[in-house]
């Protein structure tokens, strides 16, 4: 039976550092808001960050391979394709390196630095999230506002202009 690798919950995560083929990415969580610290300081995409954090908190080890002289290259772990560092609210840190998928592509090889064993992780969701491009972790909002604060909207397109105002009934928009 697969067992949980790390003994923390998603809510305990304060920071995630991710190194993949894209480079280094650093994400920090303050209450419920994610912020990108590296490669640039910017607001982060909540869904992408929550997904990665959830995968890290719930990742399970399907089986463990322990041999006296492990050839890490055979598992894509020398060097590792992906390196993750998780910092918890209490200050504790956890690290994980991800390598290749197994022959069935349903599991991924991994290791905790300093441990002389290959972990076979039960899911490749973590690998998929950790392989995302930096842009996928950035907030893509063009304008930020609370929906109930919006009273009117003007849309200008070439030779046409559209004006909308909120009516008496909430969510009822009428052309001006």
Q: Model segments located where?
A:
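A short-motif feature that recognizes glycine-rich, charge-decorated loops
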Residues: 1-176
């Amino acid at each position: 039976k697969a067992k949980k690798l790390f003994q923390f919950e998603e809510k305990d995560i304060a920071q995630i550092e991710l190194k993949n083929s894209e480079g280094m990415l650093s994400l920090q969580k303050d209450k419920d808001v994610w912020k990108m610290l590296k490669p640039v300081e910017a607001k982060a995409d909540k869904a992408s960050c929550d997904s990665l954090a959830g995968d890290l908190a719930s990742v399970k080890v399907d089986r463990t391979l322990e041999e006296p002289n492990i050839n890490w290259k055979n598992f894509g772990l020398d060097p590792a394709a992906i390196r993750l560092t998780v910092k918890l609210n209490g200050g504790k840190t956890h690290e994980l390196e991800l390598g290749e998928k197994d022959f069935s592509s349903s599991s991924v090889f991994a290791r905790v630095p300093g441990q002389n064993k290959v972990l076979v992780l039960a899911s490749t969701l973590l690998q998929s999230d950790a392989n995302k491009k930096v842009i996928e972790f950035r907030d893509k909002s063009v304008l930020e506002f609370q929906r109930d604060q919006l009273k009117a909207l003007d849309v200008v397109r070439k030779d046409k202009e559209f004006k909308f105002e909120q009516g008496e009934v909430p969510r009822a928009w009428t052309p001006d």
